[in-house]
A protein has these predicted regions:
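Extracytoplasmic beta-strand/coil segments of soluble accessory domains associated
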Residues: 136-177
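N-terminal periplasmic accessory domains that precede
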Residues: 84-90, 135-138, 157-160, 172, ...
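Predominantly transmembrane beta-strands of Gram-negative outer membrane beta-barrel pores used
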Residues: 170, 198-202, 218-224, 231-240, ...
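Short, acidic Ser/Thr/Gly-rich low-complexity loop/linker segments typical of extracellular
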Residues: 44-54
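Short, acidic, small-residue-rich periplasmic hinge/interaction motif at the N-terminus
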Residues: 26-31, 36-41, 69-73, 83-128, ...
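Flexible loop and strand-edge segments within Gram-negative outer membrane beta-barrel domains
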Residues: 269-290, 296-365, 371-389
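Short acidic/polar hinge/loop motifs at secondary-structure boundaries
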Residues: 55-58, 158, 176-203, 291
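Structural signature of Gram-negative outer-membrane beta-barrels, strongest in the C-terminal barrel
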Residues: 405-409, 413-419, 427-486
Length: 486
């Protein structure tokens, strides 16, 4: 019996015995490191620190090196001897990299894949890159639209699409026909660049919704909306040619549904420039005041928008001085300088009203009312052209989706123009001529669209308008479009 007890004690003494290792892990600030990894090298034995940064781990026979690691700190390896006490481990912060900034510029020009029209959208990012001062200068970075001077003496510009310019391109603001008739020659300068949120350029055949005037395409300008984020922006501009501009826009949310916005613009480029010394101004002198106030009500079913705008502009050009005067034969002595002066007052207003019957199907009924008063007094030497144009436009539209592929829209419209003109066609002091013109054009349209997953889009529409001057004329649109999107 004694032999058995002695043998058991001897074998127990020969068996490997594992000890417990205790310790605490802190950072270099003296704060405990929670959930740090603690393990022996070349073993599967490990643990983590508790909420106080302490740990307890069994030490296998032969294990000497204890590793402590945690994210954001350098690993620490401790050699543990047999006669160790409780370990106190300090983790040092790992090497920190400098801040990395990833900068991306928003896409400036977007090709609309979901639109049946051949449409490019110029976003606010592209407008900022162009550093434009008005609509006419906003296409400098976009090759899809060609803007040229129709008359260098007055600064009148025109847009060319598909090789044709002038009246073949329809101008829209907020999808409402605008800048027609007397306002067309200088319309590209009436819209300040900082006011614009985006521009949609459609080439070729367009929708029948907006009338019959678009032959080569449409250009629609979207202004900054008051219902977007509240903001205050001030934009100042000055050039070496002594052109100065100041722009201001602000949005205020009166409550969760009602908001208003104010946009203001002042332009002054009244210094005379005759760099080539030919006696004529190289560019017209322009001073413009522009002010717009917008309101928006965004209800669950009823949506309302309204805007009023006023603009005043003085534009002068022509001869700056007489050159090559020959006093022996009279020369130009006693003759007046050839001057061009154009004074414009323009007032606009519109309202948009929409009632949504079914949001899922997009069923809605909308009424648009728009009006403008354009008064222009122009003198070209002795020639005169003074015109007062009044325009009224209204449109009633209904739209609905039968399902996710088929939709239809129908509507009625009325456009009224009145011109009161005073002019002199001869370059002398002959008498004035007078003329009054008016035109009323009611119209109706129906348009059907088939859209298969934005890959195959077919649109067909028919429109009929009746002019009290030119009679009735129908307009048909059939625009197929298909592509494969990967």
């Amino acid at each position: 019996m004694k032999f058995i007890v002695f043998l058991g004690a001897f074998l127990w003494h020969l068996m490997p015995v594992s000890a417990q290792v205790k310790g605490m892990v802190k950072d270099n600030q003296g704060e405990p490191v929670v959930a740090a990894n603690v393990f022996w090298i070349n073993t599967t034995n490990g643990t983590v620190t508790d909420e106080n940064g302490t740990f307890t781990i069994e030490q296998p026979v032969g294990a000497k090196k204890l590793v402590v690691s945690f994210i954001g700190y350098e690993n620490d390896t401790i050699v543990v001897e047999n006669d160790h006490k409780e370990l106190a481990i300090i983790l040092q912060g790992s090497v920190m990299m400098d801040e990395v900034q990833v900068v991306e510029r928003k896409i400036g020009v977007v090709k609309s894949r979901s639109s049946v029209l051949n449409q490019d959208m110029i976003s606010s990012a592209e407008l900022a890159r162009a550093a434009c001062c008005n609509l006419g200068e906003s296409f400098t970075t976009n090759p899809s639209v060609d803007v040229s001077y129709a008359d260098a003496a007055t600064g009148a510009r025109q847009i060319k699409l598909l090789g044709l310019s002038g009246t073949y391109v329809q101008m829209l603001t907020e999808n409402i026909p605008n800048y027609r008739g007397a306002s067309a020659p200088f319309a590209l300068g009436y819209i300040p660049g900082p006011w614009m949120q985006s521009i949609q350029v459609s080439k070729g055949s367009s929708s029948v919704k907006n009338g019959y005037e678009a032959i080569t395409g449409q250009i629609n300008v979207e202004f900054k909306k008051p219902q977007t984020t509240q903001s205050l922006n001030v934009n100042l501009f000055a050039s070496s040619k002594e052109k100065y501009e100041a722009n201001f826009d602000a949005n205020v949310h009166l409550n969760s549904r009602l908001s208003t916005g104010v946009l203001a613009h002042y332009e002054n480029s009244t210094r005379s420039h005759d760099d080539n010394g030919d006696g004529f101004l190289d560019m017209p002198k322009v001073e413009q005041y522009n002010l717009q106030n917008r309101w928006a009500w965004m209800g669950d079913q009823y949506v309302f928008q309204a805007s009023v705008k006023a603009m005043k502009e003085d534009r002068t050009s022509g001869q700056a001085t007489h050159l090559h005067v020959d006093n022996s034969v009279g020369g130009f002595v006693g003759r007046e300088l050839y001057k061009i002066g154009i004074h414009t007052d323009r007032y606009e207003a519109f309202t948009k009203n929409a009632y949504i019957f079914d949001k899922e199907r997009g069923t809605n009924l909308a009424l648009i009312l728009s009006g403008s008063l354009h008064k222009q007094d122009a003198g070209y030497g002795y020639k005169l052209y003074n015109v007062d144009q009044k325009n009224l436009y209204t449109s009633l539209m209904f739209e609905t989706n039968f399902d996710e592929r088929n939709s239809i829209s129908a509507g009625l419209s009325l456009n009224y123009d009145y011109f009161n003109q005073t002019y002199r066609l001869e370059n002398d002091d002959t008498g004035l001529l007078y003329g009054k013109e008016k035109e009323t054009v009611p119209g109706a349209y129906v348009q059907y669209t088939y859209n298969w997953k934005d890959k195959i889009i077919l649109m067909g529409g028919i429109r009929a308008d009746h002019s009290d001057i030119y009679g009735t004329f129908p307009l048909k649109r059939k625009i197929p479009r298909s592509y494969i999107r990967m």
